Amino acid sequence: MPLVEKRYAQALLELSGSDINSIKEEFGDFTNLYNSDKDFRDFLNNPVVKTDKKQALIRSVFTDRLSKNMLNMILLLVSKHRTAEIPGIFNQFIQMANETANVLDMKIIMAAPMDEVQLETLREKFKKKYNAVAVNSTEIVDESLIGGLKVIIGDKVYDGSVKGRIESLTEIVSV
């Protein structure tokens, strides 16, 4: 993640205090609107439109819908011309909030679909390994793995796929 996104996310996390869950929800709703409404997104990212007009629109539409901290964050992003980074800041915020709450985010990439019992067993093993309170997982089927699976947690990759083993052997043989 770019440093800018990380800094804004960290600032919002510090401002959130005990309201972290409501900020998560508000920021998520705003980000969904930003991502889904092309006209709104184009308006906020348009360099020709004056900052005060953008802020006036944000205030008129969101003053009653967002908390003071969230509204001020959006207004700050508008004034600093950082609205294009809203999705990245949101993703970084969620990641930091989960780390603070000791929630493990993991991506499970498998060659073939796994049943829910297998997935839950895998989640539980990583939950214990990382001493996490809870686990959020995203499951993806990627047939190019040939067999097995890959688990990604932050920057760490656990590769138990056939494709990964073939690539490792190829590296050893070619050296």
Curated annotation (Swiss-Prot):
GO molecular function: proton-transporting ATP synthase activity, rotational mechanism
Cellular location(s): Cell membrane
Organismal lineage: Bacteria, Bacillati, Bacillota, Clostridia, Eubacteriales
Keyword terms: ATP synthesis, Cell membrane, CF(1), Hydrogen ion transport, Ion transport, Membrane, Transport
Keyword Cell division on entry: no
Quaternary data: F-type ATPases have 2 components, F(1) - the catalytic core - and F(0) - the membrane proton channel. F(1) has five subunits: alpha(3), beta(3), gamma(1), delta(1), epsilon(1). F(0) has three main subunits: a(1), b(2) and c(10-14). The alpha and beta chains form an alternating ring which encloses part of the gamma chain. F(1) is attached to F(0) by a central stalk formed by the gamma and epsilon chains, while a peripheral stalk is formed by the delta and b chains.
Record's protein name: ATP synthase subunit delta
Organism of this sequence: Ruminiclostridium cellulolyticum (strain ATCC 35319 / DSM 5812 / JCM 6584 / H10)
Gene name of the encoded protein: atpH
GO terms under cellular component: plasma membrane; proton-transporting ATP synthase complex
HAMAP family, per database record: ATP_synth_delta_bact
Keyword Membrane: yes
Function: F(1)F(0) ATP synthase produces ATP from ADP in the presence of a proton or sodium gradient. F-type ATPases consist of two structural domains, F(1) containing the extramembraneous catalytic core and F(0) containing the membrane proton channel, linked together by a central stalk and a peripheral stalk. During catalysis, ATP synthesis in the catalytic domain of F(1) is coupled via a rotary mechanism of the central stalk subunits to proton translocation.
Membrane topology: Peripheral membrane protein
